[in-house]
Amino acid sequence: TITHKGKPHLYALVVGTSDYSGTNLDLRFPDLDAAAMAHGLQAVGTRLFEDRVYIRVLSTAGKIPQDISTRANIEKTLKEFAEKAGTGDVVICYFSGHGTTYGQAEKNQFYYLTKDIGSENLSDPEIRNNYTVSSGDLTKWLTAIPAHKEVVIFDACHSGKAVEALSSLGAKDLSP
């Protein structure tokens, strides 16, 4: 765990998915919402954190593959945060797009749907593992980030289900 001796940094992952595989799931505003959120975080972030602001935007408006809202890019970004962030830093994650739930009873999880998915049918484990981010995935990736201050915002249907899994983040070891 990295402990910063200096001032805290802000790390933000902002994800918007408007354009899905095919046209059945396409939405109008998540890309715009992500751009607006990133702009707001940058404006407020520079007031509070000065030049110590790192914002990563992943959306379907991205022009190069590493800027697209894919599962791989989301995971890569959060793993980078885990390597760079210290205990005194702040991490914010924002997701706008489709969300759904899948699973039986207590194994039911929230799933954020990424760019390459074409339907909300998650019965195929390959689809879930390659084209979605589950609340379990997100909990695992965020737990690996040493920052004691983490905020997750979902603008997606069924996102209340994510709260159950993410509530375990409150159990992080917060000793200095």
Residues covered by each model-derived region:
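Short, intrinsically disordered, charge-balanced linker/junction segments flanking boundaries
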Residues: A171-P176
